[in-house]
């Protein structure tokens, strides 16, 4: 009787034969460790995609190495040419800003803002607000002009008043008096100077 078909009875004297024979069977570890294929892909397609993925990853690593080497070479050339880091930074910022300006997102945003601005300026509320502000400005200008005219008229009335004329006459009188005294003082200077020119008499001899 074959051992595979023996009765697995705990009370049977041959109860250890089946387990001993199963331990001798080799196990395929490769099959057990293999992951199941992705749903919808055959094993061949999966292997092909994995090979392509490995190739792309290797190309990415190579490109990064090439880029790093190019950047080092570029930095060395700039150093030898005397180009400062600040100049390179400005150039990079300028290039980045240009890239932003020509990007689709920036262009769409600018167009959207232009549309909003046009809608706002064409709206009735904006027009009414603009008209109100214009009218307020005109009223303010008219009020300032009226106030200036009133001040000028008031000053004219003050100059024509008796009080102002009396004050003006007093100022004129004081001015005339000051000028007259100054002229009289200048005329008296030669006489005093003339008396000073008189020669002194010789002292009497002892």
Curated annotation (Swiss-Prot):
It holds the Pfam family TPD52. Keywords: Acetylation, Coiled coil, Phosphoprotein. The modification Phosphoserine is found at residues 3, 12, 19, 21, 96, 149, 161, 166, 192, 195. Residues 175-185 have a biased composition (Basic and acidic residues). The modification Phosphothreonine is found at residues 163, 173. Residues 38-82 form a coiled coil. Belongs to the TPD52 family. This is Tumor protein D54. The gene is TPD52L2.
């Amino acid at each position: 009787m074959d051992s595979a078909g023996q009765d697995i009875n705990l009370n049977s004297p041959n109860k250890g034969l089946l387990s001993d024979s199963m331990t001798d069977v080799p196990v395929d570890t490769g099959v057990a460790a293999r992951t199941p294929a992705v749903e919808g892909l055959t094993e061949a397609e999966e292997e092909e995609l994995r090979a392509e993925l490995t190739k792309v990853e290797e190309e990415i690593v190579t490109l990064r190495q090439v880029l790093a080497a190019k950047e080092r070479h570029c930095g060395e050339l700039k150093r030898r040419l005397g180009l400062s880091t600040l100049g390179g930074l400005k150039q990079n910022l300028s290039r980045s800003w240009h890239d932003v300006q020509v990007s689709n997102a920036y262009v769409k945003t600018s167009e959207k803002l232009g549309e909003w601005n046009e809608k706002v300026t064409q709206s009735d509320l904006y027009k009414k607000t603009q008209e109100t502000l214009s009218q307020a400005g005109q009223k303010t200008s008219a009020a300032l002009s009226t106030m200036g005219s009133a001040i000028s008229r008031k000053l004219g009335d003050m100059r024509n008043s008796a009080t102002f004329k009396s004050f003006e006459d007093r100022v004129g009188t004081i001015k005339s008096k000051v000028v007259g005294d100054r002229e009289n003082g200048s005329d008296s200077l030669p006489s005093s100077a003339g008396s000073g020119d008189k020669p002194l008499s010789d002292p009497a001899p002892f």
